[in-house]
Regions:
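Basic, glycine/lysine-rich polyanion-binding surfaces/domains
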Residues: 1-163
Length: 163
């Protein structure tokens, strides 16, 4: 099965808008990140499973509003007992699924219905503030949060303090 991005037929590359004469850091860069497996892990409410026993690609499940990552995989905390995993290891869900029994967890591959858009530049916070109610100025590297952006549900994953 071939992974096709949800933005495959609408995403165009190039420079748009007022970019003439501006420094590279002053430009807002918008890029879709392709070729990743995206899946969600949810622990059932009545489960007593010890989460400290779980490692995905060598990573622990992160605590509230945090993320954990290595070179291939990133795990975001989405809510109580709920995590979003994305990885360049396309068969990771198959490799790790044996840790999660069906009585305690639901694992859903959502790669076909989600996309990751990376924003980069000095003005990213200003763009997010225009349509998102979160105080993005307080975000630090490794923080994540769910919110809305002009009515669209988003998950913000703060990768770096560098623009």
């Amino acid at each position: 099965m071939t992974n096709i991005s949800p933005l495959n037929f609408v995403h165009t590359t190039g420079k748009f808008g007022d970019y003439d004469g501006k420094q590279e850091n002053d430009l807002l860069k918008v890029k879709e990140v392709n070729g990743l497996l995206i899946f969600q892990i949810a622990k059932y409410k009545n489960s007593n499973f010890d989460l400290s026993k779980i490692k995905i690609d060598g990573l622990n499940l992160p605590s509230s509003l945090k993320s954990s990552s290595n070179l291939n995989t990133r795990i975001l905390w989405l809510g109580p007992d709920n995590w979003l995993v994305f990885s360049s290891i396309l068969d990771l869900i198959v490799k790790e699924k044996k840790q999660f029994d069906e009585a305690n967890f639901a694992i859903t591959n959502i790669s076909h219905s989600r996309t990751i858009i990376e924003l980069e530049g000095n003005l990213v916070n200003e763009v997010l503030k225009k349509g998102c109610p979160l105080d993005v100025n307080t975000f630090k590297e490794g923080d994540c949060a769910n919110s809305v952006y002009n009515g669209i549900t988003i998950t913000i994953d703060f990768l770096s303090n560098k623009p």
